[in-house]
């Protein structure tokens, strides 16, 4: 009954984002396994470059695009936040779509074999094994230095352990060791295109993965629209530019605000929040305030949008890393290890992922070949590659090295990867079976 109620709730609250009935829902344990037809898709990828820049193109078909994100809604005299990253899709469709790429130049041992699963670990947020927030806050590095209350992606190389199965979120290497890894290039470059938090400003979000999922150097393209001291939003829409100080809740959840409308708030359409305005029930102000980024954080430019039933996005960055400590330089003739992910109106681990692949700049042996262009990248002919993406389950680095994984010895030997042992006809079902078995064993 719980499973059916969740599916009906999503459909009733936001018909445009209605999904088929999920296979399993247990929100108390961070579980949402969507229907089989919603757990697999295809991301089309093409890449080109010239003497200065590299560009990657994405096409992702969807009938339910989301360029909305979290909002403040006025209720009974208070501003209440709406929009959740999971479990599963947000019931009101108030979470952005996202397309991500992790990229490595061969310096992160194991990424070519395990892909994104090498960054997924027991205790991470949104897993059934999620660590208690207070424990993270009390950790000297994650809570003290980073100010975090959850565990996110990290490289096992940043933890101190002799046994990979025993790798733990709290065994973080000391600062000198982390600095050395970063100087040696032992980190993953992470390009995150965000339909709400970055795209309206003409950018993708430049991040990297080391001992945590970290932001690249510079100013972010989004911040939180909230004044802690006044306990109210910091900004509202400028009525002279937008026509009203807020959006309307009913219009928002009916998906009436298009890509060319003021569905996001930013430096060019905002004024300081006026608490004395005659606010009405259901007035809505975006929870994220957008701004022009700087430094390496803003190094990836984004173009395109949703058109003819698909996201059609182009991301462009200089071949040279904007900052060698958080980004990878791309060299003509070289090949790189990559892994992709797609979020559809959901956050955290509720996404679809690819197997590890290779991206080559004129390397014909790579899975995805970036073609060289003399001159303007806008004039390039594109060579598309279809990348299958699917639900990644609760497979973690620790699980892959444990007795629960039938391929444990092959993983530990380090000579064969997921693509050597699995095919996409059977792997997605195996992953779901493993998640259900782990949940059963924990009962």
Predicted regions and their residues:
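Acidic/polar low-complexity flexible segments
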Residues: 20-22, 72-274, 322-443
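Short, well-ordered beta-strand segments enriched in hydrophobic/aromatic residues
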Residues: 53-60, 311-317
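Exposed beta-sheet edge/beta-hairpin loop segments within beta-rich domains
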Residues: 302-309, 326-331
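Beta-strand elements of well-folded, non-transmembrane domains
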Residues: 49-51, 60-64, 319-321, 342-346
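Surface-exposed, low-complexity/disordered Ser/Thr/Gly/Pro/Asn-rich loops and linkers
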Residues: 264-296
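Gram-negative bacterial Sec-dependent N-terminal signal peptides
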Residues: 1-19
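A beta-strand/beta-hairpin structural motif
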Residues: 296-298, 305, 312-321
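Beta-strand-rich interaction surfaces with strong enrichment in secreted/lumenal proteins
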Residues: 43-46, 300-305
